[in-house]
């Protein structure tokens, strides 16, 4: 079984080997090479088939099979690295811990020597990064990492479908805040997978799903099934299920149904060096989540998201009856003109308890509203009408089931 390690735990020998192997893979112009595999995600579009008159990107977003599609995609690239001599699995970048710069394994200022920095895609452009300030400085000014807090809300969910929505939208912000306004980078659905950082990011995304699965086992709850997108779970993922001319990997082609990809250890042949989160074991993490649920009443803003044909950064303010507005939160949408149509069937939720307290508002008041600002990847403003107005839900602490007052 292949071991996936934290990028910060790689030895110098492992780093040099991975860089050498990645360089070879990027120079491989066959169907086994980096660019051929990267095209599975976005451009050039391969779905429903390479021969179709009208094609879309094959990547799955806004659907219950998002985790499975990206699990098998990351495995596809990992297997290609192994084919060129890699001895460790796809390393992961644990972005749930606070950071002020990208890991030394994936810098963005060493463009000539490190093949994990950038490559040339099929349109003869280099991938580029435009890290946004929010990536390194918590936009909400919280005590912990922005990403850590959002991940806790995802891990708190006890139903796969609720978890998936939270989990997916969190991952979008890493894409957007690294790629920024660059066309050929992490913030565009079409070109994101041409940046090698994509796979380092998604190795961690997959690890977080594995942590949730272990939490579910600890809770005695289902960890390998979905009660939403039931038909999707039976449909082979594309383009992995296409012919060997598109996908020469016999393993991913044979195991391309989402329902077969819940058990990554058995089917994908890799493990993680640790399934802890910020040093917490599964049992400690569950205890922490239960404490979070019991400590105080919470207020959540909910958004029913759908594809808008573009990647976008969304910020929203909470405004009172006098139009006094305070920043309430931010999230991102990952998309583009080649995306499959999608819409979530449930709300993405963000904890807005803090801003309700600051503004001395109650969630059962009627005289408040959210104002959204939606900025497209290119930096242009989009109409807030593209997204449905946010709703509010109140979740009482488990110890005291009192009236919804968060003052």
UniProtKB/Swiss-Prot annotation:
Binds 2 copper ions per heterodimer. It comes from Rapana venosa. This is Hemocyanin type 2 unit a. Cu cation B binds at residues 171, 175, 202. It is found in: Secreted, Extracellular space. There is a cross-link at residues 59-61 (2'-(S-cysteinyl)-histidine (Cys-His)). InterPro entries: Di-copper_centre_dom_sf, Haemocyanin_beta-sandwich, Haemocyanin_C_sf, Tyrosinase/Hemocyanin, Tyrosinase_Cu-bd. Hemocyanins are copper-containing oxygen carriers occurring freely dissolved in the hemolymph of many mollusks and arthropods. One of its GO terms (cellular component) is extracellular region. Hemolymph. GO terms for molecular function: metal ion binding; oxidoreductase activity; oxygen carrier activity. The keyword Transport applies. Cu cation A binds at residues 41, 70. Keywords: Copper, Disulfide bond, Glycoprotein, Metal-binding, Oxygen transport, Secreted, Thioether bond, Transport. Disulfide bonds join 47-58, 161-228, 319-325. Decamers of large identical subunits, each containing 8 globular oxygen-binding functional units. Its cofactor is Cu(2+). Glycans are attached at residues 27, 250. Its main location: secreted.
